[in-house]
Amino acid sequence: MSVSANLVKQLRERTGSGMMECKKALVEVDGDLEAAAELMRKKGLAKADKKADRVAAEGRVVAARSEDGKSGVLVEVNSETDFVGNGDEFRAFAESVAQRALDSKVEDLDSLLASEVDGKSVETLRQEMVAQLGENIEVRRFIRYAGDHQVAQYLHGARIGVMVEVQGGDEQLGRDLAMHIAASSPVCVSPDDVPADQLSSEKEVLLAQARESGKPEEIVEKMVEGRLKKHLSEITLLGQPFVKDPDQTVGDLLKAKGAEVTRFARYEVGEGKEKKDESFADEVMAQVRDS
């Protein structure tokens, strides 16, 4: 049967799919718009399942914060390519997930995926995005802060996001700290927060290096002590030189402002993921196989 251009247009607006896909679905269900939309949804879920094993290591980090500034979230949403990750549809989806994570107050990823936005679960919306954009889309992780202190956030483009909780100080201090964390990548707030096993491992490495000098053991111990102190200042927020004024440490800055950092999180797109090195021809072939 033939279907009207208006019906095809309506289905495209509802599903975000291509004209030929919409026309084919409408023909298959004899022009029933609702049935065509449901058919395309089911086909989209099947496509999502087929794409689930493909590596998604691009995308963006997004943030949302409450009006009073005392709660906030960071969310990483992944795509397979930066082209899709920079697109308007992907950005809108990622931002809606972040807002949902903030509003719903969920504590884990499964609960976030099960929560609803405009009557659809985040997981259903994710699967629809897979069908619409033709790539594996993954809501990878999120973190939520809520308490009595101010939460500051900073996004460096779409690839790095920081959230820091600060007791005392003002809005500008919070933003400066978030920018510093984005640039300097501290592991934790203070030396007391460094895991004991990590500290012990680093000390063993430094000890082995120092002993190669052939110096007496008491000298070696002092060498290790100095190098360990330097290492801790490099990886902890309080010990790092402040990026906007390297003559003072972040710890000195906070002391001068009468403020304290209680916790922070730094997300970078794709960190810890193994990216698949694929040629353009391989990428095209993969898309053909999945179409």
Curated annotation (Swiss-Prot):
InterPro entries: EF-Ts_dimer_sf, Transl_elong_EFTs/EF1B, Transl_elong_EFTs/EF1B_dimer, Transl_elong_Ts_CS, UBA-like_sf. The keyword Iron-sulfur does not apply. Keywords: Cytoplasm, Elongation factor, Protein biosynthesis. Its main location: cytoplasm. It is found in: Cytoplasm. Residues 271-291 are annotated as: Disordered. CDD domains: UBA_EF-Ts (cd14275). Residues 81-84 are annotated as: Involved in Mg(2+) ion dislocation from EF-Tu. SUPFAM superfamilies: Elongation factor Ts (EF-Ts), dimerisation domain, UBA-like. Signal peptide: none annotated. It comes from the Bacteria. GO terms for molecular function: translation elongation factor activity. It holds the Pfam family EF_TS. GO terms for cellular component: cytoplasm. Associates with the EF-Tu.GDP complex and induces the exchange of GDP to GTP. It remains bound to the aminoacyl-tRNA.EF-Tu.GTP complex up to the GTP hydrolysis stage on the ribosome. Belongs to the EF-Ts family. This is Elongation factor Ts. The lineage of its organism: Bacteria, Pseudomonadati, Pseudomonadota, Gammaproteobacteria, Chromatiales. The gene is tsf.
